[in-house]
C-alpha cells in the first residue's frame, strides 16, 4: 500500500519555464492559482473579463518577483469563435506554446429544477463554462 504524504511541499522551481493560462484569473481561485503558479516559476497568462482585476494580479506577481505575466482580457459570455481563434493566434505568436491551462472561469446560474431553468440563462452558463 502506498503511503499518503500529506506534508508534501512542491519545489520552488516546480513550474520554472512553464507557460500556463489561467481563466478567471482576476479573483478567487483563479487569482490564487495564478499567483502560486508564478511563485513556482511559471509564466502566467492572466485571462479574465475585468482588465483592472487582471492588472492587480499582474502587479502582485511582479511585486513578488515572479516571471512577468501577460494579460489577455476576454469575456467568455460574449466571445465568438473568431475571438477564440484570435486568442489562439496571439498566444502562439507571443509564447509559441502552452504547457497547461486552468479553466477556472465559470458561472453557476440559478439552482433550480431543470424544467424551470430559463433557456437564455442556460445558454449564458454554457457559453462561459
Range-by-range predicted roles:
Residues 79, 124-128:
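Glycine-rich NAD(P)-binding loop of the Rossmann-fold in SDR/ketoreductase-type enzymes
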Residues 23, 98-106, 129:
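Rossmann-fold scaffold of SDR-type NAD(P)-dependent oxidoreductases
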Residues 42-56:
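Conserved glycine-rich Rossmann-like NAD(P)H-binding loop of the short-chain dehydrogenase/reductase
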Residues 87, 112-114, 118-124:
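Substrate-binding pocket helix/loop in short-chain dehydrogenase/reductase
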Residues 64-80:
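Rossmann-fold cofactor-recognition segment
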Residues 26-27:
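Conserved glycine-rich cofactor-binding loop
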Residues 1-21:
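Flexible N-terminal pre-Rossmann segment of NAD(P)-dependent oxidoreductases
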Residues 77-94:
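Conserved Rossmann-fold cofactor-binding substructure of NAD(P)-dependent oxidoreductases
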Amino acid at each position: 500500500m502506498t503511503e499518503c504524504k500529506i506534508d508534501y511541499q512542491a519545489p520552488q522551481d516546480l513550474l520554472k519555464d512553464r507557460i500556463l493560462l489561467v481563466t478567471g484569473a482576476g479573483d478567487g481561485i483563479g487569482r490564487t492559482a495564478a499567483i502560486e503558479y508564478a511563485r513556482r516559476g511559471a509564466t502566467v497568462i492572466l485571462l479574465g473579463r475585468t482588465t483592472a482585476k487582471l492588472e492587480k494580479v499582474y502587479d502582485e506577481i511582479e511585486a513578488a518577483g515572479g516571471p512577468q505575466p501577460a494579460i489577455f482580457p476576454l469575456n467568455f459570455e460574449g466571445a465568438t469563435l473568431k475571438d477564440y481563434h484570435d486568442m489562439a493566434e496571439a498566444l502562439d505568436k507571443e509564447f509559441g506554446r502552452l504547457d497547461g491551462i486552468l479553466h477556472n472561469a465559470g458561472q453557476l446560474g440559478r439552482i433550480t429544477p431543470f424544467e424551470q431553468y430559463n433557456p437564455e440563462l442556460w445558454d449564458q452558463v454554457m457559453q462561459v463554462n
